[in-house]
C-alpha cells in the first residue's frame, strides 16, 4: 500500500513537472514583432489564411523567420551576390520540412513508380529511331 502511494505522488510530481517544463518552453519562444502586425494581416487576407488560436502564434513566428530570410537574400540580390529575387507567397507560413511534406508528399522510390522498365534497351534495334541522315553544312 505504501509503495502505491509513493508511486502516485511520483506520477503526480512528474506530470506537474512536465506541465511546468512545457509552459516554460512556450514562453521561451520570442513574441511576434508588433511592427509586422499589419503586414501579417494583409498576407493572411491575400492568401486566405485562418488559424485557430493555438496555431496562430506558431505560424506567425515561422512567417516572420521566413520573411527575415527572404529579406536577407534580397539584400544579397541587390548587391549582385545572387541571381534571383524572392518574395512572400502562400507557403511563407511553412517550415522547410512542412513545405516538403505538403507539396511533395511522401517521396516514392523510383523503382515503385516504374517497376517493369528494363535496365537497357537498344532503341535502334526495334525501329524506335529513324536512321541518321546527312546534314547540310
Swiss-Prot record:
What are the start and end residues of every segment in region (2 X 3 AA tandem repeats of E-W-K)?
39-44
The signal peptide, as residue positions, is 1-27
Q: What is its main location?
A: secreted
Its subcellular locations are: Secreted
What's a BP term from Gene Ontology annotated to this protein? negative regulation of protein processing
What job does this protein perform?
A: Not known, expressed in activated T-cell.
Q: What family does the database annotate? A: To the propeptide regions of cysteine proteases.
Q: State what protein this is by name.
A: Protein CTLA-2-alpha
What organism is this sequence from? Mus musculus (Mouse)
- What is the gene called? Ctla2a
Amino acid at each position: 500500500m505504501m509503495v502505491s502511494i509513493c508511486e502516485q505522488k511520483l506520477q503526480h510530481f512528474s506530470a506537474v513537472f512536465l506541465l511546468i517544463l512545457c509552459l516554460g518552453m512556450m514562453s521561451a519562444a520570442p513574441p511576434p514583432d508588433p511592427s509586422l502586425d499589419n503586414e501579417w494581416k494583409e498576407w493572411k487576407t491575400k492568401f486566405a489564411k485562418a488559424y485557430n488560436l493555438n496555431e496562430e502564434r506558431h505560424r506567425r513566428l515561422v512567417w516572420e523567420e521566413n520573411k527575415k530570410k527572404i529579406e536577407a537574400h534580397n539584400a544579397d540580390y541587390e548587391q549582385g551576390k545572387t541571381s534571383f529575387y524572392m518574395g512572400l507567397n502562400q507557403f511563407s507560413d511553412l517550415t522547410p520540412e512542412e513545405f516538403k511534406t505538403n507539396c511533395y508528399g511522401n517521396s516514392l522510390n523510383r523503382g515503385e513508380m516504374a517497376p517493369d522498365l528494363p535496365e537497357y534497351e537498344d532503341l535502334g534495334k526495334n525501329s524506335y529511331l529513324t536512321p541518321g541522315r546527312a546534314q547540310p553544312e
